[in-house]
Amino acid sequence: IRTKRNRVHAEINALKKQGKDIKQVLKDAKKLPGELKKVEEKRIALANEIGEILLTIPNMMHKSVPKGKDDTENVVREKIGKPKKFSFDVKSHGELAEELDIVDFDASAAVAGNGFYYLKGDLVLLNQALQQYGLNFMIQKGYIPVEPPLMINKRATQGVVDFETFRDMIYKIEEEDLYLIATSEHPLISMFVDKILEENQLPIKFVGISPCFRKEVGSHGLDERGLYRTHQFNKIEMIVICKPEESYDYYDELLGLSKELFKSLGLPSRVYESCSGDLGDLKAKGADLEAWSPRKKDYFEVCSCSNLTEAQSRRLNIRVRKGGEKYYPHTLNNTAIATSRAMVAILENFQNKDGSVDIPKVLQPFMGKKKIEKR
């Protein structure tokens, strides 16, 4: 239609020069803008539809991912540290925290509903100590600290997650194209949307610190009054943007740093690799670090490490220039420490018979004490 429009304009000019009648040609020309608008609207609609379909295509898994139907077939790869044997009946973290008067779940439920909490006294200090220790730990390992925005738009959100699957987990701001972040990974990766990086800028290694917000809630029962699965929590998150041939080396590095961090806290843990049936659509490979719960006599997730290869960089149009060519970099993410879950592990693993809780040695300088006791 644009070609026809150009041709008609040329024809009108030619007819004018020849002194001929241009009424019919003008009549035809006036129809063209409307026709062009209709076709352009159809083109945009089809492009959007194609884009939505492309977003549903999953990533290719790495050949080393164990095969399995769901999380019951995930594989234990390694255990770090031995669980402590207690000479008394251990309490859940929620019981301990309430008895020590360092948390108030009833007050938070009254003002915000279930899945929130008021931290008090030494638990506030422990929460802050974990964030500062985790941040310092990763800075010393070469990661640059970043404090990101706590809200991002739909384009950014779609670029980092399977939006249709993730939609029910995230909070949307009414009448705004903004969503509260579920992890700082999302704004850290989308920070580079539509950008072309030079290869000598790689690797990009960030450690983000932020509150996080999710709609997910915990299971019913005693541990629902707790810190394990909540709507709001603080997290130290790591991301890497790197050359494709280096991404699995960084995957090992990220997972290794989480193991080292939790070992330094004195918490028994294990590496639990996701099988094919439990791996998210965008992940090529992933594993959780799980801490030991003496109350449940089982491990629970505290960290998650993933290699998403090109999935996010393609969706966000992040490219790297090498000479005269461009390619999509690989992206990875890893939980350095989600403080609420780390506090669950510390309260349960370091509890004493008298109801007090020992503070891990590496955190004592941040808290100025060795033990949490009832005031």
Task: Locate each region found by the language model.
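TRNA-recognition modules of translation machinery and tRNA-sensing kinases, especially anticodon-binding
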Residues: K79-R375
